Design a protein with these regions (language model features):
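Membrane-embedded alpha-helical bundles of multi-pass transporters/translocases
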Residues: 1-513
Length: 513
């Protein structure tokens, strides 16, 4: 039950963060709209945000937690403290250097990253200034991820999971109260991001101190633990960040498309992050320390059992989430974003992107379960090979879909990028499972046939229920009524799905870890 308790804690904090994130997006799109200024913020913040996800949900955690868990399990507390001190010093040194280089090279980075902006000098200059400001978040974010990884390894999940809430709260406050004091109103978001980074790191400190793990940093790149983490992390930097790399590449493509394309894709991506963060990231965060411990204990049966449980939860939640996002795309976008500077055309364009991305939600969630199966065994090379193939698939699919939409003269070219991201995620998840199965690390056993049929039956029932409920949906009402209608649609879907699962014979005890 410890796994469920930890998962519920992380999911609850993630839900709070995601809900506040939706409020944040509503506020930002209402204040700035889906136009040139907001495009510059999305592009400029994409790079530090990429590193945030790389560290908080990616390479650093995947490399550091297994090594720290091994130290905690088989060595003394003093040796653990020494490891933490050395990693702290080395990480702070590398990130400070990287941040300074990025600030100096900001124009070059923006020219490479968003070449389409260069044709508009004002837009390019604003994006460069915004990047110089937001990239400072990189140092605070990396140290926050370091502290969070330590706490997660010791079974403390609530404080690290709460940290993203502060980023959303700071950005809302910046948009509402800092904007009037800025020559360029959008720059208020950059300052809000830096304030959030400081707060996210600060809230970790008391709990580290209580656990006697608040150790002064010392630089020692030759320390055995640091050396192992670096060797694991270098390939993991690519392997666990495929989704973010694809988003970066998609942003480059989108910078050449019509104004608003970056914002439409961003808004649609935010909708997919709700189920991904609530279930996928929560499960991935919780199981990595446990899988690492099972590997250290050399207990393959418990290892496989834990992965089977995680996959079951992911498929049970991910399939209906994908279906619901596709069917409810327009009502959701209308209810959340269509106000102020965000027009009905923006709603249509964002909904199209969301429909294209919805099919990849289950794949993105499965990646969060399959990848830790390798990282817990300190195997970072396999995800790298898979990641290379996924990035190649994304690039090829981008060319194919963009070419096709140009051929048929389709106005919503940004849909091509969303479809390519979905296809790339499916390739990534499929190949990760192939190698897990091939190496007898994890496979869907014969019991999955019944489970899969139960899930499919429940999804069909949910589709029918939502289709009927949508016939009563009315967009010509007040904003709050739209929100209420969407909530009712979601309740109808959940009730229909759960009821169908029970009719099919699925019971809560089947989700026991």
């Amino acid at each position: 039950m410890a796994l469920w308790r930890s998962t519920v804690i992380v999911s609850a904090m993630t839900m709070l963060s995601r809900v506040l994130g939706l409020v944040r997006d509503i506020v930002l799109l209402n204040v700035f709209g889906a136009g040139k200024d907001f495009d510059t913020f999305v592009v400029a913040f994409r790079i530090p945000n990429f590193f945030r996800r790389l560290f908080a949900e990616g390479a650093f955690s995947q490399a550091f937690i297994p090594v720290l868990t091994e130290y905690k399990t088989s060595r003394t507390h003093t040796e653990v403290q020494i490891l933490i001190s050395r990693v702290f010093g080395c990480l702070a040194t590398v990130m400070t250097t990287l941040t300074m280089v990025a600030i100096i090279a900001a124009p070059l980075i923006m020219y490479i990253y968003a070449p389409g902006f260069h044709s508009d000098p004002e837009k390019f200059a604003l994006a460069t200034d915004m990047f110089r400001l937001t990239i400072s978040y990189l140092l605070f974010m990396s140290l926050t991820a370091f502290a969070s990884s330590i706490l997660n390894s010791y079974g403390s999940f609530s404080t690290p999971a709460f940290a993203p809430v502060l980023l959303n709260a700071a950005m809302i406050a910046g948009a509402l109260w800092l904007t009037p004091y800025m020559a360029e109103p959008i720059m208020a978001l950059g300052w809000a991001v830096i304030i959030a980074g400081i707060l996210q790191l600060a809230i970790q400190i008391p709990e580290l101190w209580r656990k006697n793990l608040l150790i002064p940093p010392k630089i020692d790149f030759k320390h055995e633990g640091v050396d192992r983490i670096m060797k694991l992390m270098l390939p993991a930097l690519f392997g666990v960040s495929v989704t973010q790399i694809n988003l970066l590449l998609n942003t480059i493509w989108a910078s050449f498309m019509q104004d608003g394309s970056v914002s439409w894709l961003y808004s649609a991506e935010r909708m997919t992050e709700l189920p991904l963060g609530l279930i996928g990231v929560a499960i991935g965060t919780v199981i990595l320390p446990s899988l690492s411990a099972r590997h250290t204990e050399q207990n393959p049966e418990k290892f496989r059992g834990m992965m089977d449980w995680a996959a079951k939860v992911i498929v049970m939640a991910g399939l209906p989430a994908s279906v619901a996002l596709f069917m409810l795309s327009t009502p959701i976008i209308q209810a959340l974003f269509e106000r102020g500077q965000f027009s009905f055309e923006d709603t249509q364009m964002t909904a199209l992107a969301l429909q294209c991305m919805s099919g990849g939600v289950i794949a993105f969630m499965l990646i969060k379960v399959f990848a830790p199966g390798f990282y817990a065994k300190q195997d970072t090379r396999t995800p790298v090979r898979v990641g290379l193939m996924a990035v190649a698939a994304n690039a090829i699919l981008n060319v194919i879909f963009i070419g096709f939409f140009k051929l048929i003269d389709w106005e919503a070219e940004h849909m091509a990028l969303a479809l390519a991201s979905t296809g790339s995620a499916m390739v990534n998840a499929g190949l990760l499972y192939y190698y897990l199965h091939k190496r007898d690390i994890f496979r869907f056993g014969s019991h999955w046939k019944k489970i899969f049929l139960q899930f499919m039956f429940a999804n069909v029932v949910m589709i029918a229920a939502l289709a009927y409920a949508l016939s009563w949906y009315n967009a010509d009402v007040s904003q709050w009524m739209r929100v209420l209608e969407v909530l009712i649609l979601c309740v109808v879907g959940v009730v229909a799905y759960v009821a169908a699962l029970l009719v099919a014979g699925f019971r809560p005890r089947h989700l026991k870890p």
